[in-house]
């Protein structure tokens, strides 16, 4: 969801903290957090926004498992004239940049999307070597990766990472069902 489609979507770090605390008080065991640029309302990977959210939730004393996303930074949309060139709608960054906030803030868990799939106007792109790198770094920081899978092929990819020793047992799966294009 976006703030344009749903005015209840929290945008600022303080709104995200408040929403997470409300969810925990209502019975949520886990809060999965993305951050947005408060000025543009667009998704952000700004570590300082994540720090404000993480510290706000932890400082509240609420008993909830913190789950930070690693998803942003894997969205590729080709230009019409040359599909090898990313359009302005793309948001690609290095695997290191995608997990920087996780390594620094060390939530209990973080999402690790084991997927490459089409979305409405872009491809969500996760190269196997990037997944291996991110999973090793995440676990070395003491964070449990939540393996997000959207179809049976993604389960096979996750199992391969487990068999090859890139994901420690027991794995923690999140089955994302009812998602368009996945």
Language-model-derived ranges and their functions:
Residues 41-70, 133-140:
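Alpha-helix-loop-beta-strand connector modules within alpha/beta enzyme cores
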Residues 4, 29-53, 119, 176-179:
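Glycine-rich, proline-tolerant flexible connector loops at the mouths of alpha/beta enzymes
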Residues 108-182:
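Catalytic alpha/beta core domains of metabolic enzymes, predominantly
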Residues 13, 17, 28-40, 65-67:
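Histidine-centered catalytic micro-motifs
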Residues 16, 23, 34, 110, ...:
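Conserved, mostly hydrophobic/aromatic
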Residues 20-21, 47-55, 99, 131-135, ...:
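Generic structural signal for well-ordered alpha-helices
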Residues 24-25, 58-61, 99-108, 136, ...:
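Acidic (Asp/Glu)-rich catalytic clusters
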Residues 1-18, 70-94, 120-124, 180-182:
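Active-site mouth loops of central-metabolism enzymes
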């Amino acid at each position: 969801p976006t703030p344009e489609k749903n005015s209840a979507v929290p945008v600022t770090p303080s709104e995200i903290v408040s929403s997470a605390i409300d969810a925990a008080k209502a019975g949520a065991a886990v809060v999965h957090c993305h951050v947005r640029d408060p000025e543009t309302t667009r998704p952000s990977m700004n570590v300082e926004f994540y720090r404000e959210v993480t510290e706000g939730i932890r400082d509240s004393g609420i008993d909830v498992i913190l789950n930070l996303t690693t998803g942003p930074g894997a969205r590729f949309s080709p230009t019409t004239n040359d599909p090898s060139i990313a359009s302005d709608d793309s948001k690609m960054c290095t695997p290191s940049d995608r997990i920087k906030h996780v390594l620094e803030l060390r939530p209990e868990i973080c999402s690790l999307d084991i997927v490459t799939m089409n979305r409405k106007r872009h491809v969500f792109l996760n190269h196997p070597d990037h997944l291996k790198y991110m999973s090793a770094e995440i676990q070395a920081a003491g964070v449990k990766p939540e393996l997000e899978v959207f179809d049976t092929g993604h389960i096979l990819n996750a199992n391969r990472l487990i068999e090859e020793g890139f994901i420690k047992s027991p794995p923690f799966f999140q089955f994302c069902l009812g998602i368009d294009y996945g």
